[in-house]
Amino acid sequence: MSVLINEKLHSRRLKWRWPLSRQVTLSIGTLAVLLTVWWTVAALQLISPLFLPPPQQVLAKLLTIAGPQGFMDATLWQHLAASLTRIVLALLAAVVIGIPVGIAMGLSPTVRGILDPVIELYRPVPPLAYLPLMVIWFGIGETSKILLIYLAIFAPVAMSALAGVKSAQQVRIRAAQSLGASRAQVLWFVILPGALPEILTGLRIGLGVGWSTLVAAELIAATRGLGFMVQSAGEFLATDVVLAVIAVIAIIAFLLELGLRALQRRLTPWHGEVQ
């Protein structure tokens, strides 16, 4: 009887597994350690609370600015909506223009010869270097910020589309042509599916660059947005607001990355696991 009980207990132990992967567990543990160190340093006042407020103060301030009181004549959600609107408009423009441009460059040596030097000339330059020029040409309104973010996203998207077209397997293209497929059918059913993983990877890279460019642009030329909140709070030495908004910026960037990874897994399941 005791042997049967021991076997059942042993089988239950074998069946139970830690629900999270090793990587996720390590990530959560790292964040927990960082928060513990932060809380300890703040509790012992090793650094002045003016420069490093405790986590609970930052959380309380985050809840405050998310409420009706807000910050700088707008709530956190209004600032967040302004930032997300800019990044979404710039991303849509980069997708609508960048992907066709990249595909055209991959299919036509003439188009590539015309556009490749232009993209390669401006691509290495940090996007913020163009900000003064954008402000001079378009003022400090929405156009300058959206155009700056668009420039940051466009190059990775276009070049990834170009790389995706170049990586299309010639065997599949010839097989489709031998079966009587037209050029449009080859493009739509062979080249585009083969290029899609590269295009989505370029979108992930471009969105990351665009998000950082957005926040930096709002630090300089904006009256609403997450970057504007950080800049304004820094001028008043409101460190708790600065840290709260930085946390929001990091969380939004993380969620955008997770969303694009999920989209990539769904649209390109044959490409293997997205890292």
Please provide the spans of the model-predicted regions:
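Short cytoplasmic-facing helical segments at TM-TM junctions of multi-pass membrane proteins
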Residues: 160-205, 226
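Hydrophobic alpha-helical transmembrane segments of polytopic membrane proteins
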Residues: 227-262
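Transmembrane alpha-helical segments of polytopic membrane transport and secretion proteins
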Residues: 1-32, 258-275
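Periplasmic/extracellular loop-to-transmembrane helix junction in inner-membrane transport proteins
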Residues: 44-92
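Transmembrane-helix boundary motif in ABC transporter permease subunits
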Residues: 89-119
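Alpha-helical membrane-protein architecture signal
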Residues: 59, 73, 77, 81, ...
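Transmembrane alpha-helices
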Residues: 147, 151, 183-217, 244, ...
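Generic hydrophobic transmembrane alpha-helix motif, especially the helices
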Residues: 120-156, 163-164
